[in-house]
Amino acid sequence: ISLWSLILKNNWSKKIANEYIKKYKKLGFSSDLALRVYTTRLLGRNKELVLHGGGNTSVKTTIKDIDGKNYKVLCVKGSGWDMADIEPPGLPAVKLEPLLALKNKKYLSDEDMVSYQKRNLIDIKSPNPSVETFLHAFLPFKYVDHTHADAVLNVTNRPGGLNFCKKVFGNKVSIVPYVMPGFMLAKKIHEIYSKNPNINCLILMNHGIFTFANNCKEAYDLMIKYVSKAERAVKKLKSKKLKQIKKFSTKFNPHEIAPIIRGLLSDNKDQKFVINYRLNSHLKYFINGKSVRTYSSKGTATPDHVIRVKPFPLIITPKKNSTIEEFRSNAIKAFENYRKKYIRYFNINHKKVKGKKVMLDTSPRVILVQNVGMFSVGKDLNAAKIAGDLTDTNARVITSVEETSTYKFIPEK
C-alpha cells in the first residue's frame, strides 16, 4: 500500500506572504510575526506533517513591553492552539535572555520549567508556551519549525533507523536519539548543535524533525526538502504486502455493536464516552492484518499521540457468522483483558519515571474490530474524531514500515 500519492508540495506564495504582512500590520503585529503565522499555517494544514495540536514553530523578534522598553523575545506556539489556524496570540512572547541564561543549568524539572517559562511571558494572560520552548530558544536562528512528518517517522521507526537516517538526510542534518520533550532534550540539542554549527536540520528519532534558518521561507523550504527526501527514500525500498486474515461475514452491523462498546467503556464507572466509527481502505488493511496484535501494540508513530489514543488499542476478532450475543461475550472478555493490561503497563512504567504519576481511566481510546472497522473514543465527539484521525495516521506509518521492514518504537519508559 502506498503511504503517499505525491511528493510533498511546497505551498509558499510570495503574494500571500505579503498579504499576511499587510493584514497583520493593520492589527499591530510585526512582519516577523505575520510571516511566522503564515508558514505555521502552511505546515499545520498538511496532515502528513502534523495533526491536532502537534508540532510547533517559533520566531525570535523584539517586542515593546508596557514599560516602554524593547525586549528580545521568543514567540513560540502555545498550548491549546493548532498550527493549521494559528493567530498571533497563539504564539506567546517569552523573554529570550532569561531562557538563554539557563543554557548551562544541569537539570530542570518539568514543573519548574513550566513555571519559569510562564514567569517570563510578556503577557501573563498568554497560553502556556510549548514544552519545547527551551529547545527553540537554544537554536540560534530566527525561525524554527517542528513537525511530526509521517515520512520522517517512517525512516526513524525501524531497526537500523539511525543509519538509515544518516544515509537519507545527508551531512547538513544531525540525528538525535530519543529524549522526552522538555529541558533535557533542549540541553541535548544545544550540545549537538554546538558540535555541528553548520547543520540546518535535526531529526529526532521516533519523534519528528526540526528545521531552522534566519529567513522564514528558508526554514519552511528546508522542512519540505527534508520530508520529501524521506518520502523518496521510502518509496525506493522493496516492499511486501501484509498478510491479511480471511474475509468473513457476521450477523451484525457496526451500528448494532456500537451500544455494546459504549456500555463496556463505562462498565467500571469511568466517565461517559462518545464513540466514532470509521473504515477506509488503509484502515481496513491495518486492522485486518494477521499480525495486527503485534504491530499495533508496539507504540504510536510519535509519543505525542499517546495522550489521545493510549499506548495500544483494544482488538476484537469476531467469529465467522457470529451473532450479536456472541460478539457481546467476546467483547466483555477483551475489555477485561485490556483493563488488566493497561494497569500492568502503568505500574511498570510508573516505577521508571521520577515523581508521582496519576493513572488515567483504564478504558481504551481505540477499538479495532477485525472485518468491521475502527471505533475511536473520546469524552465528546470532537475528542473521538481526533483519536480516529491519529489512529488513521498511525495505521499509515506502521503498515508502511511493516511492508518494508519491522515497525520499531522507543522502549517503554
Task: Map each language-model feature to its residues.
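Glycine-rich flexible loops
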Residues: 7-413
